[in-house]
Amino acid sequence: MANFKVSRVETTPFEGQKPGTSGLRKKVKVFIQPHYLQNFVQATFNALGADRVEGATLVVSGDGRYYSKDAIQIITKMAAANGVRRVWIGQNGLLSTPAVSAVVRERVGADGSKATGAFILTASHNPGGPHEDFGIKYNMENGGPAPEGITNKIYENTTTIKEYLIAEGLPDVDISTTGVSSFEGPKGKFDVDVFDSTSDYLKLLKSIFDFPAIQKLLSSPKFSFCYDALHGVAGVHAKRIFVEELGANESSLVNCVPKEDFGGGHPDPNLTYAKELVARMGLSKTHSEPNPPEFGAAADGDGDRNMVLGKRFFVTPSDSVAIIAANAVQAIPYFSGGLKGVARSMPTSAALDIVAKHLNLKFFEVPTGWKFFGNLMDAGMCSICGEESFGTGSDHIREKDGIWAVLAWLSILAYKNKDNLGEGNLVSVEDIVRQHWAIYGRHYYTRYDYENVNADGAKDLMAHLVKLQSSIDEVNKLIKGIRSDVSNVVHADEFEYKDPVDGSVSKHQGIRYLFEDGSRLVFRLSGTGSEGATIRLYIEQYEKDSSKIGRDSQEALAPLVEVALKLSKMQEYTSRSAPTVIT
């Protein structure tokens, strides 16, 4: 048993270590500066306080992006020096964000210990590699992201930090092999437990879904399946879950070997970046696929996001969460007793609202950021929730969960096809979506992302939109001058949320223009990029007339798109003639 001692290292603050909704994200070149990561980790320990750190059991893992392995060793040594009793690390340092949440909530160590929190090393859907992004966030004992009270303290601490603690004489831990390594320090024993990355997560998923029913679907010659992990950490879980447990053919897995640079790609599961899957599913504009699979899905870098596709058919994330909620009680055993409630982020379409109304469910509209859902779940008020940004999840953990969403869709397909895997036509993904629209109406929806725009220009654009809201009459005059065929604005505001659980108020959560016919325009500045500002524009139109629900989305939304771009003076403020990504 190796002994270590504790060193106090003098340091000075770095500017800009303010964690956003998903932790601290910066370029790798920023993180590898001497003391940079250490300052943030020590600021986190100090914010948590001795009672939450000394004797604690912490999970330290991530999506495997460049610099993760070095960061794991640094955090482990700092944990030892700060009096943490145990560090749990997924084999090779790999755990998806939902798997971390599952481990914190469910795993019991060999000595009966339970995790009290986690450092997750991820920048989610942002690119990885020496010249790309790295990130770190802290999750609490409920498996969810640290609340603002903690993240604000972390930031305050980064502005005044003078020293950090690190173990001296503690060797690097071999994270490629499972097993427990024990060490002795000034405060007693310190253990590092490297464990199988998928077992605890899989056990939880098997308690939620009817795996034999999904297996029956996947083994049917009628059904074909494709899963693309975009070289992110979800690939670690995919083979075990889809191939070994559910019997899918290994050839159905694409890009499922995790890579530090995500294979040079952008690990964001949308129609722009998941090119290989999009082509395979028959949705490429340049490549014709004669026989696409029935079902396809993609994950992001840390496995918490998902994109769902049918044969030549894209399911919007806003529709996806609504359809899962509408079918959950029948198709997913975990929900057989009913749903406690449902929730969506404000920019997400109102498709879920209509389902909640029909099914008489509690409904919540929250700001962007999974922690708001976590509060509702901890209070027993919400079972299923989702975001338009390809995040879907439930109260089984406190993070969004990409593989959970895929299994939810496979469960719905298995349920709808339980009597026709032999004779009869398969009920397809497209059939399920169109049946949903026929019952609940369709929310035509698109999102325009303007990435890495000049921060001052972005702020000026938002200020312009807020100023316009002072006179709805003036706004409607401007709109009629742009398009006479667009409905009137009846309400305009900056979205503000009062949490029904703790009473906290979140202001300035996005600018909204709500129209008489149920249409919406929403503008947000996003804080998850590592450089510049990202403006997100959300455009939504509700159509109840069943004869009009089959139109092309961009065609149906064209009048509102024109209004949004001209009303906001998008090109004038951003110098961009087109968005970076259209979803």
From Swiss-Prot:
Any Pfam family: PGM_PMM_II
GO BP, sorted A to Z: carbohydrate metabolic process; glucose metabolic process
Enzyme Commission number(s) of this protein: 5.4.2.2
Annotated localization: Cytoplasm
Cofactor requirements of the protein: Mg(2+)
Region (Disordered): 1-20
Active-site residues per Swiss-Prot or TrEMBL entry: 124 (phosphoserine intermediate)
Positions contributing to Mg(2+) binding: 124, 300, 302, 304
Quaternary structure and interacting proteins, as annotated: Monomer.
Protein function: Catalyzes the reversible isomerization of alpha-D-glucose 1-phosphate to alpha-D-glucose 6-phosphate. The mechanism proceeds via the intermediate compound alpha-D-glucose 1,6-bisphosphate. This enzyme participates in both the breakdown and synthesis of glucose.
Protein name: Phosphoglucomutase, cytoplasmic
Taxonomic source organism: Solanum tuberosum
Gene that encodes the chain: PGM1
